[in-house]
Amino acid sequence: KDLSYVELQGRTRVGYETEALISYLEEFLGFTQRHHAFLIGVGSLGSGLLADKGLRQFGLEITAGFDVAEEIVGTEVAGVPVYHINELATRIEAEGVQIAILTVPILQAQHMTDRLVRAGIRALWNFTPVRIQTPEPVVVQNTSMYAHLALMFTRLKSALQGDREA
């Protein structure tokens, strides 16, 4: 029933052809298109994301990193060039990038968000624990490792209690 909204025709009591369904879902989810993104904050987490080639399988290609640390600006991390944050607006305009990945320190999160929105970014993948504020048309996807860590601890506690009760 959940798949009744797709434009594919399934067969009664048989379902959908697997290959066609996978192709349709990949297209629908945007995995078949190439979405270029800039990464802001090339620290430990940012560097890890730059090195993650698996993101390309899902249509995301990080084409540049931005930071303020002089020791990293002008270098490449996993083949991705790192620029000074002062070049951000110019490069967003020149390259037409609409997606930014935010991995900056907590105290910089909202300021950097405001700067990205002013420069034309339309979607933010936010890895900071800060719930950033943006104007309505800007898409924000919050990914909090801390929230997921708390969830894991809660699930572990529940599982361990279940073991004791069994």
Model-derived features: where do they sit?
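HTH-adjacent hinge/linker in prokaryotic transcriptional regulators
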Residues: 1-37
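Short active-site oxyanion
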Residues: 36, 62, 98-100
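Glycine-rich Rossmann-fold phosphate-binding loop(s) that bind the pyrophosphate
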Residues: 42
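Hydrophobic/small residue at the entry helix of a nucleotide-binding pocket
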Residues: 45
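Short, solvent-exposed amphipathic alpha-helical segments in soluble enzyme
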Residues: 53-57, 116-119
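NAD(P)-binding Rossmann-fold cofactor-contacting core
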Residues: 56-78
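Phosphate-bearing ligand-interacting subdomains
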Residues: 76-165
